[in-house]
């Protein structure tokens, strides 16, 4: 299955706290990173291993070592930055590519305005992070950009997803795996996920008075 809704108790609990409208910016930001780390754990479960040896306190010890493609983490600006540290806490050696995608609030269409990608993308696994998968336009645009640059193995990590966004991504890119903490009911007339989390970017960066505590 290309879609993985991770219903681990820790994720369910933390996401439930994040849905509170009165949650502080600090708490929302910290929980975004924690859930991102838990999603990363699930999204990398099939990484290949190879035997290796190290010198331990009692001599040579046989261990396992991750092999295969290197990783690049790809936050979609700006909200994806809120998940970046969570991923890097588990894969600290990963290179970071940055994609800027904006959505026209009238047409709901996405357009890219920034591209800062690392090299050798054809040899890397890309983990795209964006808290909200709503219409899917931003995610599709980011995947388009990565594939044009040569990346062939891409996985998307989101906190909350709408069925409409999932369908849009899989229609455009059926080879992409989606890992999400929750598949919510759907979109409202303004293209926002219901019940969702509100505007994740505003809540992570504290750019609205309501969540700026």
Swiss-Prot record:
It catalyses: UMP + diphosphate = 5-phospho-alpha-D-ribose 1-diphosphate + uracil. Uracil binds at residues 193, 198-200. Coiled coil: none annotated. Its cofactor is Mg(2+). Pfam families: UPRTase (PF14681). It comes from the Bacteria. InterPro entries: PRibTrfase_dom (IPR000836), PRTase-like (IPR029057), Upp_B (IPR034332), UPRTase/APRTase (IPR050054), Ura_phspho_trans (IPR005765). Pathway: Pyrimidine metabolism; UMP biosynthesis via salvage pathway; UMP from uracil: step 1/1. GO terms for molecular function: GTP binding; magnesium ion binding; uracil phosphoribosyltransferase activity. The keyword rRNA-binding does not apply. It is an enzyme of class 2 (transferase). PANTHER family: ADENINE PHOSPHORIBOSYLTRANSFERASE, URACIL PHOSPHORIBOSYLTRANSFERASE, CHLOROPLASTIC. Belongs to the UPRTase family. This is Uracil phosphoribosyltransferase. It comes from Bordetella pertussis (strain Tohama I / ATCC BAA-589 / NCTC 13251).
